[in-house]
Amino acid sequence: MIVSLKEMLQEAMKGQYAVGAFNCLSLENVQGAIQAAEELNAPIIIQLAEVQFPCAPLSLMAPQYLQAAEETNVPVVVHLDHGQSFQTCADAICQGFGSVMFDGASLPFEENIRQTNEIARMARACGVDVEAELGRVGDVGVDDASKDVFTDVQEAIRFVNETQVDALAVA
C-alpha cells in the first residue's frame, strides 16, 4: 500500500522506530526489499537515485516500483533519491513517485533554499512530499573528517523554516 513520506515518518516518530530506505536497481531488488518488509511487517521506502538512471531508467523503473508498492499490505513510500534538478524531480512526480528528494547540498546555502522552494512549490501542488539535503551526506571520504562537511544546526533550522520540507537529510 502506497503511503506518503510525511505520514510514514510521523508514524515512525510516534512509534519510536526507524524506517529502512532501499535503492533498488531492478524488479528483483524491489520485490526482495518489499518481501523482507512483509516478513517483518515493517514499513519501507523504495527509492531510485538520479545517478542510477543510466542503468535503471526512471521511465522503466517507476511502473515496477508503483505496482509492487500497490500490491503489498505493508506501507511503502516510492521515493526519488538525490534528485539533482527541478526537471528530474518533476519527471519523478509525473511518473507517480509520491516523494522526491532534491539534493542541493553542493549549492551555496541561499541557492539551495531558492531551488528547494521552487521544487517544493511544484511538488506540493501535486500532493508530493519533499526531502532536501544540507551538508555532504554520503559524499565524505575516510580522510575527509573536516567540520565544514557537517550540517550546521542553525542553518538546518533556518532551512526547514524557509522551505517547509517534509524531511531533511543532514551530515
Residue ranges and their predicted role:
Residues 3-11, 25-52, 58-75, 83-171:
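Alpha/beta enzyme core
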